[in-house]
Structure formats: C-alpha cells, structure tokens
C-alpha cells in the first residue's frame, strides 16, 4: 500500500465495502456525537466521512484534531445505514471506520475557516489565499479556469494554429497603458519593459513566414483596478493570422469562443448570430462599446422634439453646436416612484438628475403623458416622442442632453440600471456582438490627437484616409462584447511602413521616434510583410463570466488587491541598498 493513500477522498463507493484502505487529506470538520466521532476528510477530489468510536485505537488522537490538520487514516470501508446516505456526495453511500491515524501536518488556529460559506473581508482572504483556495467555490473556479485553458489550447490546435512563446522581457511601447519597467544591470540607465501584449512579436512571427500563431500569453499593464480587470497582469488567448481580412478573423475565433461557452456555460443559452455593430451606432444606442444586448433597450436621438420647445433647458442647450438630446425608453417604468429611483441613480453618477416622461391612462380612457417635461412640451410633442420610441401606457422615457461625449457613458449605465430594475435582462444567456469601425484617433483633453485603440491597426482607406481629418479615420479594429464585457479585441495590422509612419505622425510621433521605438518591426516590414491580423481574448474575464462571478479576483489563483498589492507575498517591497547599487538606481522621496 502507498505510504499516504490507496484512494482519494472522492473515490470510494459502495463497491469498496469491506476493503482496508488508506486516505490522506485535510480535516474539514469534526463532529462528536456522544462518543462517536464523525470526521469529514477532504482532499482535492472530494470528501469522505471517517468515523471512530471509543473502541478505535485512533479515537484519542482524532478527538484532539484541529480543523485543516493534514492526516493519514487507515481504516475499513463500511456501507452507511440507508437512512444516513448522503446523495450530495459521490462517497455518500460509505464511511470509513478509522483504525489508525497519523498527523502529517498540524494546523494552527485558522484566521479563515475553510468549512462553510461565510464571507470574509477581502484583505483576510488575500493574505491567507492558500486557505481561501481550499474553500469549495474558489477551488472550483480555479479548476474551471484550468479546464477552460486546456479546452482553448486544444481548440486552437484543431483549427490549425501553432503555439509559440514570445519574450517576457522586451522594450517599452505605447499600447494604451503604463508599462512595468525593469532596470538593466548590464546597461545602467536603461530599462526593459514587461510586455503589455505580445503585439509586435506576433506580427513578426507572421513576417517570419509562419501562418497561424497562438499562445496563452501573460500580459502586464500598470492599470487602475476595476472589478473586471486585474491591476497588474492577466492572461489572454493571443492569436495572429497571415493573409486575412477582418471577416476571416471573425470566422476563426467565433467557433472557439462559441464552443467554449457551450461547453462551460452551465446550460445557459449561447447566442450564435453575432451582429456587426459600428462603434458610432453602439455608442448611440447603448452608450457603450461593450453593450449588454440581453437588455432590449435602445436609446434614440429625440432632439427635434425639444428644439424650440417649451422645455427651456433642452431648447437652449440645443442652440449650441454638437449637442443633442437622447431618450432612454423604460417599458414598464411608468411611475413616479420608479422615476425617483432613477433620478437617485443619476445623482449617484454625478448628474443633477434625468428628465422623464411617463405615460398613463387618462380619465377619458386615452393615453396621456405626465411629468414636468410633458407639461412643458405639450401633448403633440409628447405623443410624437411616444410614437418614435414605441412606448405606451405604463411606460416611461428618460432624457439626457449635451455633447454626446459628456453624457454617453452615464446614459449607458442608466440604460443598464433601467434594464436591471425593470427585469428586462435575461440572465440565462450569453449574447455576443462584434463592435467594428472604431475611430483610429481621439482628441485628448489637452487638444492633442492620439490613438484611440491599437496603434498598429490598418486605417480603413489606407494612406489616402490619413490625409484628411484624423478624427474621421476609422481603423480595421474590432472588439467582441458579451453581456456588457469586452472579451476579445483585435485588428487588421498596418504592415506597410509608409502608412505606419503617417499614422504615427498624426499622433505626434516623428519618423525617428517610430524607428527608435519600433525599429525591429519597421525593419521587418521592409523585407516583405504579408497582410495579417488577429485578436486576443481575455481568459480571466471569460472565466469570470462562465463562473458567474462579478469580481475577477474570484477566478485568479493569486490576485493582487485593489491597490495592486500582493498581501500574501508582501509585494511590492522595498529593494535593498545592494540591489539599488547594482542597478545604479536611487529612490527619490515622495513629493
């Protein structure tokens, strides 16, 4: 017999009754029922009930055990009384009568009990993550993640992709976030960077003549944390293909993502018709470039009904260039109480409130509009708004106005809140959409033009498109949205040096700077670069959706906290003076 176990704690069934066996695992819990001990012994595979009475040689030692002590048990498998069978456990038909026990690893008093589903502060959970990972729900999430990664890897090989690994230490490049810099000991004053993505390397793989690449890639970005984003590092399914257009990439990745959600989605419906929604349309209708299409609400522009109207706030606002008024339909939200709740939501978003109209049955049996805006507009205009929005008795509409960039994001969040409050969102499905035709550039608060998405994307229209208004240029860039999250992002790449130089010039990068920062890729493009494109799918976020979690740290084995700290390992930590001397660095005091 093995020194530690003949079976796992999830393996024994009624067929093993009468067998002499050996188990090892953690003491999940101990119950003393009047001289008979019941011990739930747990390992990675499951739980087996161990019993010992006062006649057992192991009784005295078992009686002193603390929870989470690691023990080895020798014993005999017995069938449970039929009334005591536990159908929730694979081992629920049997129990093991202990004849001998050895402590393999003692446990101190626990700062975080493993048994039960009590919630604990995140700081405690992350400090004692090794204990937290023993808890069933988190343990299952991490195992789900492992199965997802294996499934993705197999699916990519089946599609003819080849797996390659790209460097982890590389040069800094502008890819939308701050780099993590690594000082060079051999080259004082110079720094490497951890890659935000394998972007340049995967393009160089295509230039090198390989046709279809993928890897499960670690990415490093010094970002502000969110519930759906890690502040330091994450993993993505990264892929690139030669001689492809945008639709070719879509055809390659859809069966992978769709199949993954069908396999691990827990029976939730998986949408198979993935619409292509231009970025401008997504922002107009949904107030987001990652819309939750489970919510049927679509916003509409209703400026014409307010222009020159008796509702002075919007009428005056619409006299300014570039302004509009948008309506958010709220089917079933036609009550003042609901309007008050939504106004409270808007105030929580930093707005003074949202205008609203709701429709109700009048005394004469017709449908009439109510609310402050309705009084100011009059029945003719409110009826026109109702008709445009397709609303009726018992419904409402909420209104926001101004320059779209000042209110679109809040309008999108309000749309989501209205959908949730009114029960319009079907939680039992995954709905996907490709967001396409992203603007290549955006204007910052300082008035400067910069890339809005991926700087290595091919502009639609090629070089000619870059000779006009930069803000009118669209790129061959695309995101895949699912249930309000961005799951995939990608682009057809700019593989022509002359177009690349011009594209970067518009964003304020001179030719010399482009050569300095991206010299390897620019040089490669001068020696015959194929048209190529690809995308990357965020594995952490995908697993978060599949596990039905709302916090990405619930699907990462050892995550950072919201302040980008590893409470378990004590990172970040201060370097020693010797390390600083070797690297010729000095730490300046915080100003």
UniProtKB/Swiss-Prot annotation:
Residues 199-202 are annotated as: Aspartate. Pfam families: GAD (PF02938), tRNA-synt_2 (PF00152), tRNA_anti-codon (PF01336). ATP binds at residues 221-223, 486, 538-541. The keyword Aminoacyl-tRNA synthetase applies. It is an enzyme of class 6 (ligase). Keywords: Aminoacyl-tRNA synthetase, ATP-binding, Cytoplasm, Ligase, Nucleotide-binding, Protein biosynthesis. Its EC number is 6.1.1.23. GO terms for biological process: aspartyl-tRNA aminoacylation. One of its GO terms (molecular function) is aspartate-tRNA(Asn) ligase activity. It is found in: Cytoplasm. It catalyses: tRNA(Asx) + L-aspartate + ATP = L-aspartyl-tRNA(Asx) + AMP + diphosphate. The keyword Nucleotide-binding applies. Disulfide bonds: none annotated. The record marks 33 as: Important for tRNA non-discrimination. L-aspartate binds at residues 175, 221, 453, 493. GO terms for cellular component: cytoplasm. Homodimer. Aspartyl-tRNA synthetase with relaxed tRNA specificity since it is able to aspartylate not only its cognate tRNA(Asp) but also tRNA(Asn). Reaction proceeds in two steps: L-aspartate is first activated by ATP to form Asp-AMP and then transferred to the acceptor end of tRNA(Asp/Asn). Belongs to the class-II aminoacyl-tRNA synthetase family. Type 1 subfamily. This is Aspartate--tRNA(Asp/Asn) ligase. It comes from Paracoccus denitrificans (strain Pd 1222).
